[in-house]
Amino acid sequence: MHRAAAVDTTPKIVFYYKCLLNKNWNEPINNIFWGEFFLLQPRLEVLSQLLRECPKQELTVNGPKFHSMYLYISEILKSKAESLRIRNSLATLQTFLAELSVRKPTDVNFTIFLLLGNIDSIDIQFSAFIKNLCQLVKDSEDVQSVEISLRFVLHFVSFLYNSSFISHIYGNYDVFSTLYTVILKRKFGFETAVYAIGLLSACDKFETVNTFRLGLSKIVDEEFFSSVLSSSAQQLISLRDFYVSIKPDNPLTGSFFNLFSLRSSSNNPDSDQESQFSRLPDERATMFFTIYELCCCNKLFLKKLVEGGEKNGEAPLEALLSLLSYINTHQRQSERSHHFSILSLILFHIIIDDRSLLYRLTDKKFKISVRVCSQRYPYPPNATKPATPLGYMLDICCIGIQHNMKLNLSATMYFLYFSFVYRAMTSLVQDGIRMEYHWLELWRVLFSFLDFVSVLINTSPTEDVTRLLELILDVLAYIISNGDALVIRSDELVDLFYKLLHSSKNFSSFSSKIPDERLGALNYLLEVTEYLTSKTVDLPRSTADEVESVIKLELESIPVAKQNAFGGVPPFKESQYRLFHKRASRGMADLLRRKSEAAN
């Protein structure tokens, strides 16, 4: 009994783990050792625990052992007959990366040099490792090996994302060609490759020449685009449905509710639901990054997104717009939501800037059905009614404006929302397009925001508030001057001028707040309101119906703005928002890394 009790039942692989981490264990480590090591069933939980308990000094002393493991893995990746060893070795290496990086997450260089070797040989050895890994993914017929290799690539990308070593990956043609081939052929696990191309394309794109991004810009294969869009749509729908699982959408109503009346509605999310929303969007939003980056660098993909559709289920554009409505509704809940809301607006600007797509965005023959978020008041009217893509994009802007207002001042968000509205209006007028849309609700949002800014400009005047006031006045002046070229029904135009009259009480205080060279829009709005006031001042009771009747009679006589009377559409450059882009991409890389480590 005593002899039996003394038998060591420690699994052999655990014994080897302890040997590797023991600085006094000096037995030779060669390919024979690693060959047996990676045939044994990994005990990754045990390895993680041992790595966490090992002092940093001992890790440093044992660095040559870890580097030997890395070199063996690099070589074995070239052998198609070693599927078991390949799967075990990549899982083990991923655990090493995860646990060592957690020890000092602000400095991945310690982990990199510990595993990958000294500075003299790291470039050559790392390039060989990446090349062999990519070749395995392209050539292997073992489904499990391909899947785990792709997961390792994604983890490696997210692990190296904040270091200078990431350029060794996005600058490596083998990586690009491998991910392209996997997606094109829809190999098992290709969804992981779709995640990876979004992160790699976004990395350092404003600071250096990202050759991975250049490769994406040259793709013309529609099968590749279809694979990306179908995979992305599934993930975007899944994420959207997760929002809905936290809180079902409210019953739909006929119009936007008043901005200030329903902030505390019992149908708004409770504190527990707000907490859950604050953790979204999750790693599935990386698919949005992929769509975003491809739209930025590849016009053919952008065209495919806008014009392409699926006969069964939600089309990719429908899925994308639906998710963005939820993200913009909850964009004040977390920094990640805020960043993705900004990226969604940048994408809207990129789409509207492509004039060849405007017809598709506005033609009623190409209406789509998008599930728009109604989890929080206020929300758009007729959210289930088919509409044009541009109509839904304007709805998302209205959602974001109203949910951002009063609660916090995010000047960047406002500038993007209103500059998009301005850009959309000018595009419609210049192309002579009258779009079917619930214009009355857009007027309501614009004038509600004007009331909001009028309070800010008098109580908390800042440079940002002044710029916002100038922008909203430019937008309103342009719409007032060109309203007949936008709307289809005259009652929509009448309502616009009625709301202008109702808000005119604020105009007199604006003159002293705006520089003289920027007063053109305000002066034009004052001219129009003075004209309409002169026509309605003698009404017996000045009821809404009476005022609207007079406005309807005067539509043809309302003063027209002089050419260049007010500011044009603000110039747009994606690089203006590089900081938000970098924070969003690095945040998603970090989230993917942590998810991968937790799953491992």
UniProtKB/Swiss-Prot annotation:
Its main location: membrane. One of its GO terms (biological process) is Golgi to plasma membrane transport. The chain crosses the membrane at residues 409-429, 437-457. It is a multi-pass membrane protein. InterPro entries: ARMD3-like, ARMH3_C. It comes from the Eukaryota. Keywords: Membrane, Transmembrane, Transmembrane helix. The keyword Transmembrane applies. One of its GO terms (cellular component) is membrane. It is found in: Membrane. Belongs to the UPF0588 family. This is UPF0588 membrane protein C20F10.02c. It comes from Schizosaccharomyces pombe (strain 972 / ATCC 24843) (Fission yeast).
